[in-house]
Amino acid sequence: MFEFKINQLQKQHPTKLIADGYLEPRPIYTAAAYDKEGNTGTESRTVHLGVDFWLPAQTPVLTLFDAEVVTAVHDTEHKQYGGLVILKHKEDGLIFYTLYGHLSLASATALTVGDILKKGDKIGVLGNAKENGQWAPHLHFQIMLTMLDYTIDFPGVAYPKQLQVWKSICPDPNLLFKNPKLVTEYDASISEIIAFRGKHLGKSLSISYQEPLHIVRGDGAYLI
């Protein structure tokens, strides 16, 4: 269903690239690997640390900088990366890493740790749902300032309580793209909220408050 919606949106805007998601809270990470037991119950990794580019399977992915391959694996777990490549870069004395998730199995594993790539070289191609962790085809792109102790994986989503730590490790990918359309923080005004709800919601869903509540999502019978 989600892939269908993405395809329909792309048909409506054929010249646009569908992308977004840095620090976006998402309730879609349903595999057990995203959960842990905390002091107040189950905690879930929900805050997205990269940008997603929604493109068809087999779309080529190129490196933005000269790079060394430090990870090239097939992450086979459900709702994980599928084909995963992580590159190490050194630009103007700064060492950092870029992560490319949801690649095809064949293209990700065609690389070997230690391989050297030049700017513009092909990293791989996007995988389909059968090989990319059971997601609609897309590229998960992420920047890291350190690999910590990870060698064959790296978190792509964080626990909300740890957000400030992970923001310092994984800066906004839009620092590279500098595209105002990728700015994710948006605080709608009351008038904008009213206009949007009037356009998209039926009158039966109106809520009797003088000022509308700023509802960001629903969970079961609850509005959050």
Predicted region positions:
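Surface-exposed, glycine-biased beta-strand/turn segments
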Residues: 1-82, 119, 169-180
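Histidine-centered active-site/metal-ligand motif
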Residues: 48, 89, 102, 138-140
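A residue-level detector for short acidic-glycine micro-motifs
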Residues: 55, 71, 102-105, 128, ...
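Zn2+-dependent peptidoglycan hydrolase active-site motif and core
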Residues: 63-107
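Flexible, gly/ser-rich surface segments that form the specificity/activation loops bordering the active-site cleft
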Residues: 70-84, 121-138
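Generic short beta-strand
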Residues: 85, 141, 221-223
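Acidic, glycine-rich catalytic/binding loops that coordinate metals and/or anionic ligands
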Residues: 109-121, 128-131, 137-181
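N-terminal glycine-rich, Lys/His-bearing helix-loop that initiates the first secondary-structure elements
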Residues: 181-224
